[in-house]
């Protein structure tokens, strides 16, 4: 068995070796074939490369020959061109030399001619000098003969002649001037009427006559008792704080707020309306509502002033001036609302300045600010003209605005078209029938004077004229004025009013000194 296995294994090994040997021979034979093929291909490539190199050498020789030929041709052309240029330059040089020679000969001829003329001129000059002298001698002889015959000298004759000419000319000039003056007056009147007609027809202003009372509506007459309060505390607080008269009478569902000061009256009216809506009518709540209304009115005046500046399209303006414009809503002059009057003047001035060829925007700006001092009159000393000039100078307003403030009351001459338009518009607005009431204005001046007299004393916090000017209520600082000094202060104010203000009847001076202590429990 073992022998069989060994014999089988030997046969297999021998078969494998024979197969390996045969495959090795076949592989070597194939490799030799590949090598021969590769050598044949390499030889073919080498032959082809040599052929290409040969062709390239031939091509390069042809290109070199062509380049040499082109170079020679270009060289020949350049030489020919250079030769032509040299001939042209030589020809131009010869031409220039001939031109130069001709010009030199011409200049020599002209110089010779000028010298000859100069000699002739000198000869003629001598001849003219002698003729001039002979002419002057003849004129002197003629003048002497005329003076001898006329019996007057040359200066006298000249003066007489000039006097006659001047007399005749003066008469003619006066006639012409008078004719042109008449024509100018007629034309100016026509032009002025046209401008006024244009201004008044293009602007329709509102009529605003201010009253002295405001009406506050009540939902129920029982509210009158609550407004008066226990022992009159509420109404005393209201009148003292607001500085107005609160009139509670038999008028159903209404109370009246009376004051000549439009600003205080408007604040009082708004305060009462808010108190009625709130329902809590007591001194502490009254002060709280009053302070809130004052803050709201300050903001509203600024907002209204900004709207007016934007509507008029007059450019940027300082916020303080804008606020003062809004405050004009609560000022009046001869019963005419100051803001309505100011707006009317601004619009009219803009239209008239435009018709006359001026700056319409500047005229409107000057018209809007011409009475700005009225917004400060009750707070500062001085006329509204001086106050207006001060505030406008402080905020660097245009010189035309300053001139308009002065000129509309005749304090300065009119210096511009815009200023003239403002003055004309102011007169037009004030002279309109029904625009102003003289009696009301005199009353307001009297009441304002009473308040100013009371306010100028030391220790006075506030002073209000009430009851149509028949009573002045003076609120003093309790820490500065004692009870005895209050009596003396009332007498001093009464004496000054007697000597400084003209008024019918009598005026009651009521000095109020209130001491209040406030503390908070925390």
UniProtKB/Swiss-Prot annotation:
It is found in: Cell membrane. GO terms for cellular component: plasma membrane. The chain crosses the membrane at residues 7-23. GO terms for biological process: mRNA catabolic process. It is a single-pass membrane protein. Keywords: Cell membrane, Endonuclease, Hydrolase, Membrane, Nuclease, RNA-binding, Transmembrane, Transmembrane helix. InterPro entries: HD/PDEase_dom, HD_domain, HDIG_dom, KH_dom, KH_dom_type_1, KH_dom_type_1_sf, Ribonuclease_Y, RNase_Y_N. Residues 212-278 form the KH domain. GO terms for molecular function: RNA binding; RNA endonuclease activity. Its EC number is 3.1.-.-. It is an enzyme of class 3 (hydrolase). Residues 338-431 form the HD domain. Endoribonuclease that initiates mRNA decay. Belongs to the RNase Y family. This is Ribonuclease Y. The lineage of its organism: Bacteria, Pseudomonadati, Campylobacterota, Epsilonproteobacteria, Campylobacterales.
């Amino acid at each position: 068995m073992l022998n069989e296995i060994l014999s089988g294994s030997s046969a297999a090994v021998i078969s494998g070796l024979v197969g390996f040997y045969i495959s090795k021979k076949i592989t070597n034979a194939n490799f030799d074939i590949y090598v021969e093929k590769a050598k044949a291909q390499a030889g073919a490539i080498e032959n082809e490369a040599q052929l290409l190199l040969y062709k390239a050498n031939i091509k390069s020789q042809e290109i070199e020959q062509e380049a040499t030929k082109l170079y020679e041709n270009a060289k020949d052309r350049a030489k020919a061109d250079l030769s032509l240029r040299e001939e042209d330059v030589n020809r131009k040089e010869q031409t220039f030399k001939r031109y130069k020679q001709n010009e030199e000969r011409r200049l020599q001829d002209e110089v010779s001619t000028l010298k000859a003329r100069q000699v002739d001129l000198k000869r003629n000059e001598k001849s003219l000098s002698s003729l001039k002298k002979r002419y002057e001698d003849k004129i002197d002889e003629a003048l002497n003969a005329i003076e001898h015959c006329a019996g007057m000298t040359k200066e006298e004759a000249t003066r007489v002649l000039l006097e006659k000419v001047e007399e005749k000319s003066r008469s003619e000039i006066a006639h012409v001037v008078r004719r042109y003056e008449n024509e100018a007056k007629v034309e100016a009147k026509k032009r002025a009427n046209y401008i006024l007609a244009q201004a008044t027809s293009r602007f329709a202003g509102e009529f605003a006559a201010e009253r002295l009372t405001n009406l506050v509506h009540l939902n129920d007459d029982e509210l009158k008792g609550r407004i008066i309060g226990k022992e009159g505390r509420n109404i005393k607080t209201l009148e003292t704080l607001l500085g107005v008269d609160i009139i509670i009478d038999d008028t159903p569902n209404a109370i009246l707020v009376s004051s000549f000061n439009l600003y205080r009256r408007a604040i009082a009216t708004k305060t009462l309306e808010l108190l009625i809506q709130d329902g809590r009518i007591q001194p502490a709540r009254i002060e709280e509502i009053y302070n809130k209304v004052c803050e709201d009115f300050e903001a509203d005046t600024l907002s209204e002033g900004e709207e007016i500046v934007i509507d008029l399209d007059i450019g940027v303006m300082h916020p303080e001036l804008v606020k003062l414009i809004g405050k004009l809503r609560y000022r009046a002059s001869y019963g005419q609302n100051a803001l309505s009057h100011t707006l009317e003047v601004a619009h009219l001035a803009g239209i008239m300045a435009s018709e006359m060829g001026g700056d319409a925007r500047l005229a409107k700006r000057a018209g809007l600010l011409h009475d700005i001092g009225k917004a400060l009159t009750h707070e500062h000393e001085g006329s509204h003209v001086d106050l207006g000039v001060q505030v406008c100078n402080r905020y660097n307003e245009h010189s035309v605005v300053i001139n308009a403030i002065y000129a509309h009351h005749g304090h300065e001459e009119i210096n511009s078209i815009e200023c003239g338009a403002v003055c004309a518009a102011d007169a037009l607005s004030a002279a309109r029938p029904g625009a102003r009431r003289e009696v009301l204005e005199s009353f307001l001046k009297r009441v304002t004077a009473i308040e100013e007299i009371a306010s100028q004393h030391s220790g006075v916090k506030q002073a209000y004229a009430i009851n149509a000017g028949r009573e002045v209520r003076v609120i003093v600082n309790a820490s500065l004025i004692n009870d005895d000094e209050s009596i003396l202060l009332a007498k001093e104010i009464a004496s000054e009013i007697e000597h400084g203000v003209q008024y019918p009847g009598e005026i009651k001076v009521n000095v109020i000194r209130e001491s209040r202590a406030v503390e908070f429990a925390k």
